[in-house]
Curated annotation (Swiss-Prot):
Residues 1-33 form the signal peptide. It is found in: Periplasm. Pfam families: MdoG (PF04349). Disulfide bonds: none annotated. This is Glucans biosynthesis protein G. One of its GO terms (cellular component) is outer membrane-bounded periplasmic space. Belongs to the OpgD/OpgG family. Pathway: Glycan metabolism; osmoregulated periplasmic glucan (OPG) biosynthesis. GO terms for biological process: beta-glucan biosynthetic process.
Length: 522
């Protein structure tokens, strides 16, 4: 009867009734979904309040422990989070200890709820670390790691680590940890001192069966800034991370470093070890690569300077930048333990227009490989006010296939070698002449397609503190590329020397720009 009565209603009335039914269904259906907007609301609210420093609840025994003791506290793999779900992703957690002395809140997000993942000492094997069980009952986690069978289907591997400040590390198939990324850098290399924002809370979406990606949200906090982040992790030969970020300023900052990367450079062919070492090179990265908005490619080999060094590259709407590990042969490093040949490069691919700004490279002196002494980031020319978020999106690539990042129509630098400058005498013996020599190998498909007799030359510029005494380019039949030999005399060794070079054939540019700084006091 109801159907008959409704069928006799005027058409307009029927449509109105149907619309009301649909609206009622929408209002009563489970339409809730967690998003970066939820985190951004918290970040904006935090930015409007005074900063509250995180409080440590860590017993002194754990705070004062040595690294060897901290390493003994291992997560029990059989207790991995989501181990009973039909998903290849698992979570494991870091215990607090040493300078990781502040808990972070970690939540699981499902289609209907947000639930905190509670700390329990049962997650961990404490090894020989003696402790009072009551003192660790409610500690909280220091961070977490993402587990995924990236190298073989029957073996779980750690592919991402989030531990300390806003640091995170990522690897792809066949890679080992090296370079780190961060959420935000503030006042890096300024006399006032650097401020290290920290991720204070995470939300991790429970993956569905068959999902090949993992979604992580993070809330960032520091004395002068807050932020909301969304990370989408895609494991693979090159693991990629899509990053969506919204940063709010609490107070004025001297320098805001977006998409920061942190790495290590101790020595290499362009700056050999001052002491005899069987390893030809020791570094997580050996150069900064920039793809500028105007299409120019720049390669800046890294240094371990004797004094803090900051290099700036003005770039509007960058197409990409990163700290790369060029050189993938084991013989380039000869290190069986630390496998620097397997450490990934990190490449930032901006999404959308970033506007006017600069890529900055910071090089810090270090005496050993335990200190990360290289930082690179993009900093905007104009900072937003406290009520306006600075929103930047980008994709992070962690790769060992550096040549695939590069434009195929432009040659790139495969290695930079430094040597004592010399001149061959009439008796064929080479004698030093007080100059410094650099040998730069350029390779790439564009060069392989050229005949060895092609008149390739180098456009070179040297700063006021250097005098060029040789600029020679010759074909390299081994690499099917060209080698630039550049010799210069330094006027004042207490000052650095800036150099730039690129290969050309007539009016055509063949290569990226090699941009190098010979450090002072060397």
């Amino acid at each position: 009867m109801l159907v008959n009565i409704l069928s006799k209603k005027p058409r307009a009335a029927s449509v109105r009734w149907l619309g009301a039914t649909v609206l009622f269904t929408l209002l009563t259906s489970p339409a809730w979904a967690f998003s970066i907007d939820d985190v951004a609301k918290q970040a904006q609210d935090l930015a409007g309040k005074g900063f509250e420093a995180p409080k440590s609840n860590l017993p002194s025994q754990f705070r004062e422990m040595k690294f060897a003791d901290y390493q003994q506290i291992q997560f029990n793999h059989d207790k991995a989070y989501w181990s009973k779900l039909k998903t290849p992703f698992k979570l494991e957690f870091y215990h607090q200890g040493m300078y990781f002395d502040t808990p972070v809140k970690i939540n699981e997000v499902t289609s209907t709820t947000v639930k905190q993942i509670k700390y329990s000492p049962d997650y961990f094997n404490f090894g020989s670390v003696k402790h009072d069980p009551d003192s660790v009952k409610n500690l909280g986690f220091a961070g977490f790691k993402v587990i995924y069978p990236i190298n073989s289907a029957d073996k779980n591997d750690e592919i991402m680590s989030l531990l300390g400040a806003s640091y995170f590390r990522v690897v792809g198939k066949g890679q080992v940890y090296g370079i780190s990324a961060r959420g935000l850098a503030i006042d890096t290399a300024l006399p006032s001192g650097e401020e290290f924002p920290r991720f204070r809370e995470f939300w991790v979406e429970r993956p569905k069966q068959g999902d090949k990606h993992l979604v992580i949200y993070a809330l960032l906090d520091s004395p002068r800034a807050t932020g909301a982040y969304r990370f989408v992790v895609y494991p693979g030969r090159d693991t990629t991370v899509d990053v969506e970020s919204k940063v709010f300023l609490r107070d004025k900052v001297g320098k805001l470093g977006m998409a920061p990367l942190t790495s290590m450079y101790l020595f290499g062919p362009n700056q050999p070890s001052p002491t005899l070492n069987y390893r030809p090179a020791l570094h997580d990265s050996n150069g900064l690569s920039i793809h500028a908005g105007n299409g120019e490619w720049i390669w800046r080999p890294l240094n371990n300077p004797k004094h803090l060094s900051v290099s700036t590259y003005q770039v509007e709407n960058p197409k990409g930048f990163g700290l790369l590990q060029r050189g993938r042969n084991f013989k380039d490093y000869e290190d069986l333990d630390d496998r620097y040949d397997l450490r990934p490069s990190a490449w930032i691919e901006p999404r959308g227009d970033w506007g006017k700004g600069k890529v900055e490279l910071v090089e810090i002196p270090t005496a050993d490989e335990t200190n990360d002494n290289i930082v690179a980031f993009w900093t905007p020319d104009v900072l937003p006010d406290a009520k306006t978020p600075l929103a930047l999106n980008y994709r992070l690539h962690f790769t060992r296939d550096e040549d695939k990042l590069h434009s195929q129509d432009i040659a790139y630098v495969s290695q930079t070698m430094r040597s004592t400058g010399d001149v061959k005498q009439s008796n064929l013996i080479r004698e030093p002449d007080g100059s410094v020599a650099f040998l730069v190998d350029f390779v790439g498909p564009v060069l392989k397609g050229l005949d060895g007799a092609t008149p390739v030359a180098a456009q070179v510029s040297i700063g006021d503190n250097g005098e060029m005494v040789e600029n020679n380019v010759r074909y390299n039949p081994v690499t099917k590329g060209w080698r630039l030999t550049l010799r210069l005399k330094v006027k004042d060794d207490k000052k650095p020397v800036e150099m730039r070079a690129a290969l050309v054939n007539g009016d055509k540019t063949l290569s990226e720009t090699w941009s190098y700084q010979l450090p002072a006091n060397e």
